[in-house]
A protein has these predicted regions:
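ATP-binding N-terminal substructure of ATP-dependent carboxylate-amine bond-forming enzymes
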Residues: 1-100
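Short beta->alpha connector loops
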Residues: 9-13, 79-80, 129, 158, ...
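Flexible, glycine-rich phosphate/dinucleotide-binding loops
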Residues: 13, 38, 103, 147, ...
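Hydrophobic anchor at the start of a short beta-strand
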Residues: 29-30, 123-124, 171
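Short acidic-hydrophobic, aromatic-tinged amphipathic segments that line or gate anion-handling sites
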Residues: 47-54, 126-130, 153-156
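Flexible loop residues that form catalytic
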Residues: 52, 79, 131, 144, ...
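A conserved helix-loop-beta module that forms one wall/lid of the active-site cleft
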Residues: 87-153
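Phosphate-binding site of ATP-dependent enzymes
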Residues: 154-188
């Protein structure tokens, strides 16, 4: 039996991991959350109340939970947690099911992802605020670090750019890609 800890278990990723692994007779799933979440309803084994990753005591608390529950593998289930744990992998008292720190860092930043994939046909053209002219519109702006469509903005006219002046480092401004958006999450 493999003891697998999912944190945070109430995130969309955490719930998907549960759905993917809940019937595997070789896996004992344990859900962990800092706050009360839907994970409480879904996970048979649920632990609540660990500090946030920004706390100085987080790693100590996490390792105690890992040891107390004989955890073999930790699956991080939120973007910031994935990056944080990849940076602290050597401190963990169990295996971590995620990519290396460099890959996690690139994946967390849209700008870094665009830089790595620059020149590929499927990457939209990106702009700096100072380079944009009327003929470039409409455009699309999104935070470099973010998820769930939070902070996105469609730029229809030059005046819309006033909100983004001085924020070239915080936002990615790209050509607007029309049509349906599809998101694919996969855990196998």
């Amino acid at each position: 039996m493999i003891n697998v800890l999912v944190f945070p278990c109430g995130s969309e990723i955490g719930l998907e991991v549960h759905n993917a692994l809940k019937y595997d007779k070789h896996i004992n799933l344990v859900g962990l959350s800092s706050v009360s979440s839907h994970g409480r309803v879904v996970y048979k084994n649920y632990i609540e109340g660990i500090s946030f990753i920004t706390s100085d005591t987080f790693m100590e608390e996490l390792n105690k939970i890992i040891e107390d529950n004989n955890i073999d593998v930790l699956i991080p289930a939120y973007d910031d947690v994935i990056l944080y744990l990849s940076e602290h992998r050597d401190e963990l008292k169990c295996k971590l099911a995620t990519s290396n720190k460099t890959t996690c860092d690139i994946a967390r930043s849209k700008r870094k992802t665009y830089e790595v994939l620059q020149g590929e046909w499927y990457i939209p053209e990106a702009f700096k605020v100072s380079q944009i002219t009327e003929k470039d519109l409409p455009l699309f702006a999104k935070p470099d670090i973010g998820q769930g469509s939070q902070g996105i903005m469609r730029i229809e006219k030059m005046e819309d750019l006033n909100l983004l002046k001085g924020k070239d480092d915080e936002y990615i401004i790209s050509e607007l890609l029309p049509g349906q958006e599809y998101t694919v999450d996969c855990f196998t």
